[in-house]
UniProtKB/Swiss-Prot annotation:
The chain crosses the membrane at residues 34-54, 165-185. InterPro entries: AAA+_ATPase (IPR003593), AAA_lid_3 (IPR041569), ATP-dep_Zn_Metalloprotease (IPR050928), ATPase_AAA_core (IPR003959), ATPase_AAA_CS (IPR003960), FtsH (IPR005936), P-loop_NTPase (IPR027417), Pept_M41_FtsH_extracell (IPR011546). Its EC number is 3.4.24.-. The gene is ftsH1. It comes from Salinibacter ruber (strain M8). This is ATP-dependent zinc metalloprotease FtsH 1. In the central section; belongs to the AAA ATPase family. In the C-terminal section; belongs to the peptidase M41 family.
Length: 686
């Protein structure tokens, strides 16, 4: 048996750092330097010592006998000496003759020459005295009788022992074990199991400047945000340029934008361009169930940052700790408030010339505490929006740079097909296209792979094996044809680029895809056209089959939401007037219960919304009755071909009456796809 005894963490540290340690031994010494290895080794050594102690005690312990057997041995003259300990335990010694003649039970003898004197330890025995028996009187009577017969009497004595060791083991050991376990879990929970990230050692938290750097070249698009943060880079590179004139750069930069737009990547690029350490942490990492843990982590983080200055601290999802204190319904917890207070103190407690820049990201700036946004803290806010067409093309070029592409792949065409896509979504499309090409055994990623990847990302995975009855297929085909025809002939709708009755995703039974126009303002006529197009599927069902199905559930939800927004938010109702009740934009620190309008106004709003939806439904049904032959022909073609692209739609419906599809004339090969799908579910075909 071989044992490895570890003396102390300091000894291991000195050995690991010795020059004799070769490169191959470094992982071993790194493991041995862990405190867990030290404690495990100590526990193994302690268990070994306890095991050896038990074995030794068993080897030297006297043989135990029954009390009745003890009394019989006394009467037979086999007992030489008796010691009564604390009135209960009896330790005795047999006579040598009784042991030699095997009159009594003893432990096995050790190896010894013949005729040797019997070992006294072999003659020892022990038993336990019942409380009711008077052993002393019994031994006196035995000795008196033995004197008359000439037999040797039994020597006996009563003693008292204080078993403080047993008491200590009985009470102290369990108590110490419980306290140790409690302290261990308290420490683990206080650090969240991340002692190596926050606290005395933040090596894993900080990415040093010597590693692989992310630069502005890796961040496609975001031209305006990069210009804003370029000043931070210049400050970290040459701080004296600003300090010599007495100016101070803002120490806090808040990046605001939707998810996936590149906020974290931009912060890393700032650190990479400046060549300084970068600390990235999520706002939720500060939060624990124990009060004071979050504040302690904030202090440790800023202490480490000051030691590594110049550096950048990036807090992702800062709204996790920066929410408004004392919000409606007690929105802030005590721990979060303490953490936020400590963050405010730290941000207000160091000078800008220390070289520590704090960057944070959130997609909920409306819920942040006002003290966090005041001058001197996060006083510079940079908005990061979803990329436009030119920026999307640049992002596609970055993500396809490592792919083996076919000559048919055009980033400009892909950018035109993906309005509203963020950088993370574009990266997902490129990755899906590469996986599809590999699955098909191709040597390069083709444009068709990107087309299929777009369908998969927007509408879900194709479910070609889903069983649909012929009657339901006819309903789905007319439903999607109704969407396409209404959208094709209205002025303010998005161009229809694809119609499909192939089931996709978890619930889509069919879908009509549109290419959204990149615009920010919508008139009342534009919103009415969009609602009319959404009701085209239900209208086709009513006209052809005389009834509506549950397939229009999602369409009705979108229409209802748009109609309420027109009346309540945008003031587009002549009956209600140009009023906005901000129903979708309540402030986080506003009152929890607020009645924005009277019951009479609520009833008027409901009636106006119903009138708007009925108007859109009537427009859709009138247009579909006018185009009934085209509706039936398109549905039949969908039942045969399952998918109709733009070229097939133009051949079937003719040129759009409100202008050609300019992007189709450019010959970019996008007639097979689009960017936005009106998906379907079991209760909504699209």
């Amino acid at each position: 048996m071989c044992f490895c005894i570890v003396s102390s963490p300091e000894a291991m540290h000195s050995n690991a750092d010795s020059p004799s340690s070769g490169p191959g031994l470094q992982p071993v010494w790194t493991t041995l330097r862990s405190p867990y290895v030290f404690w495990i080794g100590g526990a193994i050594l302690l268990a070994l010592l306890v095991h050896l102690g038990i074995k030794w005690q068993q080897a030297s312990a006297p043989v135990r006998i029954e009390y009745s057997t003890f009394l019989e041995h006394v009467e037979s003259g086999y007992v030489e000496r008796v010691e009564i300990v604390n009135g209960k335990r009896i330790n005795g010694t047999y006579t040598a003759a009784a042991v030699q003649n095997d009159r009594v039970e003893t432990r096995p003898p050790p190896a010894a020459p013949m005729g040797a004197v019997v070992d006294r330890s072999r003659r020892a025995f022990a038993t336990h005295k019942p409380t009711a028996h008077e052993l002393t009187a019994f031994l006196r009577r035995h000795n008196e009788a033995a004197t008359g017969t000439g037999t040797a009497p039994v020597t006996f004595a009563a003693t008292q022992e204080s078993d403080w060791v047993g008491t200590l083991l009985l009470w102290g050991l369990p108590l110490g074990l419980i306290v140790g376990i409690w302290l261990f879990f308290m420490r683990r929970m206080a650090t969240g199991g991340r002692e190596e990230q926050i606290g005395s050692d933040t090596a894993a938290l900080f990415e040093e400047a010597g590693g692989r750097r992310v630069t502005f070249d890796d961040v496609a698009g975001l031209a305006e945000p990069k210009e804003e943060v370029a000043e931070v880079v210049e400050f970290l590179r040459r701080p004296q340029k600003f300090t010599r004139l007495g100016g101070a750069l803002p120490t806090g930069v808040l990046l605001v934008g939707p998810p996936g737009t590149g906020k974290t990547l931009l912060a890393k690029a700032v650190a990479g361009e400046a060549g300084v350490p970068f600390a990235s942490i999520s706002g939720s990492d500060f939060m624990e169930m124990f009060v004071g843990v979050g504040a302690s982590r904030v202090r440790d983080l800023f202490d480490q940052a000051k030691e590594r200055a110049p550096c950048i601290i990036f807090i992702d999802e800062v709204d996790a700790i920066g929410r408004t204190r004392g919000g409606p319904g007690g929105a802030g917890t005590g721990e979060r408030d303490n953490t936020l207070n400590q963050l405010l103190v730290e941000m207000d407690g160091f000078d800008s010339d220390e070289g520590v820049v704090i960057m944070a990201a959130t997609n909920r700036p409306d819920v942040l505490d006002a003290a966090l946004l005041r001058p001197g803290r996060f006083d510079r806010q940079i908005s990061i929006h979803k990329p436009d067409r030119l920026e999307r093309a640049d992002i596609f070029r970055v993500h396809v740079a490592d792919l083996r592409l076919d000559a048919s792949v055009d980033p400009e065409a892909l950018a035109r097909q993906t309005p509203g896509f963020a950088g993370a979504e574009i990266a997902n499309v490129c990755n899906e296209a590469a996986l599809l090409a590999a699955r098909r055994g191709r040597n390069a990623v083709q444009m068709d792979d990107f087309d299929q990847a777009l369908d998969r990302v927007m509408a879900g995975l194709e479910r070609s094996n889903k069983l649909i009855s012929p009657e339901e297929r006819r309903v789905i085909a007319h439903h999607e044809s109704g969407h396409a025809i209404v959208g094709w002939f209205l002025e303010h709708t998005d161009p229809v680029v694809k119609v499909s009755v192939v089931p996709r995703g978890l619930s889509a039974l069919g879908h009509a895809q549109h290419l959204p126009k990149e615009r920010d303002l919508y008139s009342r006529e534009a919103l009415m056209d969009r609602m009319t197009m959404a009701l085209g599927g239900r209208g086709a069902e009513e006209i052809v089959f005389g009834r509506a199905t549950t397939g229009a559930k999602d369409d009705l939800e979108r229409v209802t939401e748009t109609a309420y927004a027109m009346v309540v938010d945008y003031g587009m109702s002549d009956r209600i007037g140009p009023l906005s009740y901000n129903r979708a934009e309540r402030r986080a620190d506003g009152p929890l219960f607020e009645k924005p309008y009277s019951d009479a106004m609520a009833a008027a709003i409901d009636e106006e919304v119903a009138d708007i939806v009925r108007e859109a439904r009537a427009r859709a049904n009138d247009l579909l009755r006018e185009k009934r032959p085209l509706l039936d022909e398109m549905a039949e073609r969908l039942l045969r071909e399952e998918v109709l692209g733009v070229e097939a739609l133009v051949a079937l419906l003719g040129s759009p009456p409100h202008g050609e599809y300019a992007w189709l004339k450019e010959g970019d090969g996008t007639s097979r796809n689009s960017a936005s799908a009106e998906g379907a579910s079991p209760s909504s075909q699209g």
